[in-house]
Amino acid sequence: MRSVEEQQARISAAAVAPRPIRVAIAEAQGLMCAEEVVTERPMPGFDQAAIDGYAVRSVDVAGVGDTGGVQVFADHGDLDGRDVLTLPVMGTIEAGARTLSRLQPRQAVRVQTGAPLPTLADAVLPLRWTDGGMSRVRVLRGAPSGAYVRRAGDDVQPGDVAVRAGTIIGAAQVGLLAAVGRERVLVHPRPRLSVMAVGGELVDISRTPGNGQVYDVNSYALAAAGRDACAEVNRVGIVSNDPTELGEIVEGQLNRAEVVVIAGGVGGAAAEAVRSVLSELGEMEVVRVAMHPGSVQGFGQLGRDGVPTFLLPANPVSALVVFEVMVRPLIRLSLGKRHPMRRIVSARTLSPITSVAGRKGYLRGQLMRDQDSGEYLVQALGGAPGASSHLLATLAEANCLVVVPTGAEQIRTGEIVDVAFLAQHG
């Protein structure tokens, strides 16, 4: 029986990242940046107001409002016995204004947030520090040089790296790329994943199952798991186990996908037909892996391009767990990720856990956090391993997989275990 780590290593060796492509930044979210994005211009590109108010020379308003009683006189204003200054307002500069004006000594210009500052202005008075006047403004408090001013290049200077290679592009990175004027960016594309299910008992959810028939769960669930892993998914759906039809469909998918997943090809009536067809397309190895659920599984590289192809159990829970442990890391490696596995934390068990002897367990669980101590706690879901691997409802409730080491058949309440986050937590 092969260990989980040995099987993962064999699969990882087959990972090939598709050639990077250049895409519009609106399409880059969730992908890994494949270049160092170097800025060509400063951001912001000019000195601008950081708040609605009045652009002034800081020297003209120095001391106004100080408790020390410093009085400042202006040629166009009077001091009314308090530390208050009146300045003439020489117009308004709106955000987006393209004509630069020049501020004269002892003057103010009303500005909007984001508006370019007039020449010589080095501070902005917020409206709350004034009386809000339109032609003349009473200054109630002075401002030092640089107050409420965004200087050109404060955020990014020419030659700075805005987004580094290897960064997963999210909303903030898309915004930064737009801010520095990049329309397109080089990324590692999503690997194309084809998902199909084999089994004479399967019927699509659009039809009513007859006696002995069950809905096709796997092609839908595994396609969703592929999208969660950031693959570009083609859900083929139910495929006949007729050798001719099966061979044509699989061969067609090998020509258009970087990864192929077939559920239902490792046991039961369909197994022999599936393996016979796949053996004509390349090398497919079906082995027992020391894990539970999903011990029996297959992996090979098929077609002229050696496309990584997986055979997963027909049991939906087992299929999803094998996808999580074996298929997902390959997809993440193909995206260019250096650390393709889910985040692992240590958690204290809230109930006893039973695993299968001699196998590494991946058991469904509910992870929570103690509000006082911050400690992770985990509640195992489902019953005994042999009787609960088919219970899809408990997997839908789970937000983690409890990883039970090989040889640890019994875990007592209060013991510490490793827990892998699932989709809701990253």
Swiss-Prot record:
Listed SUPFAM superfamilies: MoeA C-terminal domain-like (SSF63867), MoeA N-terminal region -like (SSF63882), Molybdenum cofactor biosynthesis proteins (SSF53218)
This enzyme's EC code(s): 2.10.1.1
GO biological process, one term: Mo-molybdopterin cofactor biosynthetic process
Disulfide partners: none
One GO cellular component term: cytosol
Metal-binding among keywords: yes
Pathway: Cofactor biosynthesis; molybdopterin biosynthesis
Cofactor(s) needed for function: Mg(2+)
Enzyme class, first EC level, given as a word: transferase
Signal peptide: none
Catalytic activity: adenylyl-molybdopterin + molybdate = Mo-molybdopterin + AMP + H(+)
Keywords from the UniProt entry: Magnesium, Metal-binding, Molybdenum, Molybdenum cofactor biosynthesis, Transferase
Any one Gene Ontology molecular-function term assigned to this protein's record: molybdopterin molybdotransferase activity
Entry note: cofactor: Binds 1 Mg(2+) ion per subunit.
Family to which the UniProt record says this protein belongs: Belongs to the MoeA family.
NCBIfam families found in the cross-reference section: Glp_gephyrin, molyb_syn
Annotated function: Catalyzes the insertion of molybdate into adenylated molybdopterin with the concomitant release of AMP.
Protein name, entry field: Molybdopterin molybdenumtransferase 1
Organism this protein belongs to: Mycobacterium tuberculosis (strain ATCC 25618 / H37Rv)
Phylogenetic classification of the source organism: Bacteria, Bacillati, Actinomycetota, Actinomycetes, Mycobacteriales
Gene name in the database record: moeA1
